[in-house]
Amino acid sequence: MVAKVNVDLCTGCGSCVDECPAAAISLNDDGIATVDESECLDCGSCEDACPNNAITIE
């Protein structure tokens, strides 16, 4: 399982970036969250932090 970002819902607020304990999330050049799947811990912190429900653990 890994965090997945719905690009249609992501506003680039950075809440997920701030909350990720593994530093596995960054904002791309378009301001959309991207997940480094090899670093993701599947902890759900980003999912909980996202105010737009743009991240799910799948």
UniProtKB/Swiss-Prot annotation:
Residues 2-30, 31-58 form the 4Fe-4S ferredoxin-type domain. It comes from the Archaea. GO terms for molecular function: 4 iron, 4 sulfur cluster binding; metal ion binding; oxidoreductase activity. It holds the Pfam family Fer4_7. Signal peptide: none annotated. The keyword Nucleotide-binding does not apply. [4Fe-4S] cluster 1 binds at C10, C13, C16, C50. Its cofactor is [4Fe-4S] cluster. Keywords: 4Fe-4S, Electron transport, Iron, Iron-sulfur, Metal-binding, Repeat, Transport. InterPro entries: 4Fe4S_Fe-S-bd, 4Fe4S_Fe_S_CS, Fe-S_Ferredoxin. Gene3D superfamilies: 3.30.70.20. [4Fe-4S] cluster 2 binds at C20, C40, C43, C46. Binds 2 [4Fe-4S] clusters. Ferredoxins are iron-sulfur proteins that transfer electrons in a wide variety of metabolic reactions. This is Probable ferredoxin.
